[in-house]
């Protein structure tokens, strides 16, 4: 059996070069990937190919507000860091705070949660609702696309073999009301059976923007477009009668 190589680059530039040359599997927090390749307790996981560990790359960490009001989140920023940041929209903070156990939230990254493309992932749903974009980087440069377009189906994404998810961009949000609900077999440390998200902007008693989606019930997050169209333009007083 051919020996699997493990690469630990010191810079993003080095990581991109290795990714181009080897096509190695990207590993950040490893909360899903380590489980998927587990051989049992106390046994080294058996990866089927080379592994590129990017957890230590400073270029992929941190949260910052941009001049246009959008928020940039590095791909290796953890769920716990996102949940604790006042820069992050409330809808995403709530979803991040609901992910699994505390230990998992301290290791799971936003890039991994998107890249894993699991319909049960907690963070992609609010990201899709907010029209967030993912930045995909290779040695040739960057390209940006909506998270909704990046996740094609269960475990299927638009990531190319030489690319790495480097950041997520959330456009400026002006929602006046947001909602996130996760349904699982228990209150904590649960895998989602169903997730529901909604966000609305109400001005002068009128719904000027409304978005809703569900997750974990299909191959990817589903926007409730018809429900959105029905509510936009309605007076809030009409919705209570």
Predicted regions: what is each one?
Residues 1-241:
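C-terminal structural segment of proteins
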């Amino acid at each position: 059996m051919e020996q699997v190589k493990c690469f630990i680059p010191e810079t993003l530039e080095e990581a991109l070069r290795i990714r181009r040359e080897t096509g190695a599997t990207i590993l950040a927090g490893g909360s899903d990937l380590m489980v998927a390749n587990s051989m049992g307790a106390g046994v080294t996981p058996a990866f089927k190919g080379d592994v590129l560990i990017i957890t230590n790359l400073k270029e992929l960490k941190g949260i910052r507000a941009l001049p246009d009001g959008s928020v940039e989140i590095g791909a290796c920023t953890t769920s716990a860091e996102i949940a604790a940041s006042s820069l992050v929209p409330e809808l995403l903070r709530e979803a991040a705070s609901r992910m699994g156990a505390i230990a998992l939230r301290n290791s799971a990254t936003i890039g991994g949660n998107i890249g894993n493309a699991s319909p049960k992932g907690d963070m992609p749903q609010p990201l899709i609702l907010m029209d967030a974009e993912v930045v995909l980087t290779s040695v040739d440069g960057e390209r940006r696309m909506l998270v909704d377009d990046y996740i094609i189906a269960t475990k299927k994404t638009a990531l190319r073999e030489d690319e790495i998810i480097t950041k997520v961009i959330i456009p400026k949000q002006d929602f006046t009301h947001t909602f996130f609900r996760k349904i699982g077999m228990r209150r904590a440390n649960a895998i989602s059976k169903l997730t529901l998200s909604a966000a609305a902007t109400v001005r002068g008693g009128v719904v000027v923007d409304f978005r809703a989606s569900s997750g974990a019930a299909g191959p990817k997050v589903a926007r409730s477009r018809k429900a959105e169209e029905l509510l936009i333009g309605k007076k809030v007083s009409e919705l209570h009668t």
